Swiss-Prot record:
Family indicated by similarity: Belongs to the purine/pyrimidine phosphoribosyltransferase family. Xpt subfamily.
Predominant location category: cytoplasm
Matching Pfam families: Pribosyltran
A GO BP entry: xanthine metabolic process
Superkingdom of this protein's organism: Bacteria
Source species taxonomy: Bacteria, Bacillati, Actinomycetota, Actinomycetes, Bifidobacteriales
Enzyme class: transferase
One example GO MF annotation: xanthine phosphoribosyltransferase activity
Record organism: Bifidobacterium animalis subsp. lactis (strain AD011)
Its biological purpose: Converts the preformed base xanthine, a product of nucleic acid breakdown, to xanthosine 5'-monophosphate (XMP), so it can be reused for RNA or DNA synthesis.
Official protein name in the record: Xanthine phosphoribosyltransferase
Amino acid sequence: MQELEERIREQGVVKPGNVLKVDAFLNHQCDVRLFDHMGAAWAEHFNNKHITKILTIEASGIGIACVAATHFDDVPVVFAKKAQSINLDGEQYVTHVYSFTKQKEFPVIVSKKYLNAGDRVLLIDDFLANGKALNGLIELCESAGAIVEGIGIAIEKGFQGGGDALREAGYDLDSLAIVESMDAETGAIEFRH
């Protein structure tokens, strides 16, 4: 998606350790118009999938998923929580994922009330690096008997292999910007097309 690539080039900051900082528009301050355009792009890509639910993971995926849902007949958005809470009652699906950004493992939890057998799920997230978070969401869907119809990612770090592995596993993955390489010293960012 050219618009997203331009924003990454203009406002993204490459940090050491393969970190791409895009908090000016994606995951701290949110550009809702950009999110709307992203949702429209995913709706076009997944238009034949009959999505009944969108699943993301807290926190950065929530805004993107909610705006995207308006392009999918306002289907419900469920976000997996990263910590147990007194607000999470009843039976739950739980798995554990390792966060590249946080450099630690954490639980991922969804109430069984909100993820059901037969749900046709679109997974949405802001970043895809090694695929650990998405594999956790896929595992939650499998536990529920839900069908993963597709995966929508804002920015994929193509050089970290998670996207390639998901494609090889047969998932319909639509990453709107795929970073092929980036250099913390020069700030250079190259995209895959």
